[in-house]
UniProtKB/Swiss-Prot annotation:
GO terms of biological process kind: NAD biosynthetic process via the salvage pathway
Listed GO MF terms: nicotinate phosphoribosyltransferase activity
UniProt cross-references to Pfam families, sorted A to Z: NAPRTase (PF04095), NAPRTase_N (PF17767)
Family (UniProt): Belongs to the NAPRTase family.
GO cellular component, one term: cytosol
Protein name as catalogued: Nicotinate phosphoribosyltransferase
PANTHER family attached to this UniProt entry: NICOTINATE PHOSPHORIBOSYLTRANSFERASE
Sequence positions bearing Phosphohistidine: 224
Annotated source species: Photorhabdus laumondii subsp. laumondii (strain DSM 15139 / CIP 105565 / TT01) (Photorhabdus luminescens subsp. laumondii)
Pathway: Cofactor biosynthesis; NAD(+) biosynthesis; nicotinate D-ribonucleotide from nicotinate: step 1/1
Function: Catalyzes the synthesis of beta-nicotinate D-ribonucleotide from nicotinate and 5-phospho-D-ribose 1-phosphate at the expense of ATP.
Documented EC number(s): 6.3.4.21
Amino acid sequence: MTLDATPIIKSLLDTDAYKLHMQQAVYHRYSHMPVVAEFRCRGDELLGEYATELRHQVNMMADLALTDAEFNYLSSLPFFKADYLDWLKTFRFNPQQVNISVTNGGQLAIHISGLWYEVIMWEVPLLALISELIHRHHSPDNTVENAVNQLRKLIKLFYQHAENEGIDLSSFKLMDFGTRRRFSHRVQHAVVSELQQHFPYLIGTSNYQLAQQLGLPPVGTQAHEWFQAHQQISPDLASSQREALQSWLKEYPNQLGIALTDCITMDAFLRDFDAQFAKNYQGLRHDSGDPVQWGEKAIAHYQKLGIDPMTKTLVFSDSLDFQKALALYRHFHNRINLIFGIGTQLTCNIPGVKPLNIVIKLVECNGKPVAKLSDSPGKTICEDNEFVNRLRAAFDIPQVKQAC
């Protein structure tokens, strides 16, 4: 096999913003913490045949480094401290941290281990690599124009439905969350550029490289791994979620204040999300479970705490498309501020193309298991049933179907 000498990932900033935001917090607070992350394909695709190409691309990532222009760009943002950015200039991917193999059944297996503040950077570019490699083989004739034309059709339908239903779009806000499962880097760039030029409700992108290139706000706070890791950082499992929330506020006391709610289910989250947290965080992000039920719970929680929901923001990001976002906007408009993060349905929405349902999740921290007990049973991640039972008991949650 002749391997392509052109790297797919060409910039350290070709990643989601929350990776850098979390990396800074880990660098400052947990710099000696070892972790393990693993790849999951939730679909039925056999991806093992691409292992050699993937390894080749991973090896080339060792050459990536923050450029002077990228350093200056990050320095201009309010999120980052000088000590972290100085260290980031020295950061290099270490391909030896990534073990790529093929199971007897032909599945792709990826095991990533090392210090958390280094391992944290692998997830997004690895998933983007896998997605682009597979689509190159499955859909070699698809073009960027196909993706942009499809987007234009979807936007037209969006406007038609909004007009037909008399929906005031003045408060609608969209963010691009499409890096991880994009068809290709070129498609993501073209789609976000199209939105920037022709969809006035776009308020940002999660991709730092695109944010820099297109002059868009970078968006993103923290991911499940932040809460998962604290299950083994906190001395008490029952207080681990509160410790994760508090530690984030110490790093970012006045910004990046959208909290992810579904690492251990929304109900367990709200029990920990007391008046002080609700006051200090700007809002909440939905990533699993029924979005309407979730939003109603969030609004009721704010009201119970005496907080006006119109001073807070809900971010919806679970498998959204334009029509789902419009339906949620119609339901919650004028009751709470809303933002919609659309990912795969923006950057891998091409007729005839099946997006991959792939993830990389934390499975260990400090040599011990961690778990994600999602509001969607199929999204639950576990490696150790005994630990899952301890987690359920600590947070008083019922039996959850596990996706191990």
